[in-house]
Amino acid sequence: MATNAANRTNIFSFIPKSISSEVFLVWLINYLDSDCKYGQYKQSFFDNLLLKRDDKGKLVSEISINRQSNNMETVLSFHFNASDERQDILLLFVDKESDMVRPEQLDRYKWIYPNCYRYIYYKTGYVTTIEEQTVSQNQYDLVTDGMMESVLESISELHPLIRIYTDYLNSEVEAFNYYHERLFLNHDKEILHDSAAQKYLLDTLLENIAEDNWSIKIE
């Protein structure tokens, strides 16, 4: 598979994805905040990914990041238009190989970090409809690889590392499109020798069973 071949030359393919996503985003935000010449790119990144729709365009300042060691959460703090009120965003990084975070866990994070400006659930990899519904019902905002790739594409030429990470996300998105085509359009059972394809198939079947949808067919 071409996508897997491309990934073997990408540094991010050698790190657990939830860790690489967190480390990259922490680096990126600090990088964009390091020099005023990046101001418009920082604002674009916040507008397109982190701010609520009604707050897009508000200037972001006094950024700080608090990473929680041995946990999946990172707290991003900032101020609007140099105001005194601090805004906190809780970012949860969920690995593609892990089960989705359960509702009680999502509630627990809200109890630990109350009154956040936003609660963001960043799932690296395939997101089932069930997982998407669980995240929404618990009032978290879902961010996917495809969404992140789209946001980063506009600033990817700023630094080689941004381009590398964007390419990696693109290869991950293409992989799931590839599995879907081979399994459900071409009815190719040989792809099931790939463990990632097996996981994609199981997730898809569980999702359709939960929705009482029996239209999936592999000949």
What label would you give each PLM region?
Residues 1-219:
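Charged, terminal alpha-helix-loop-beta segments
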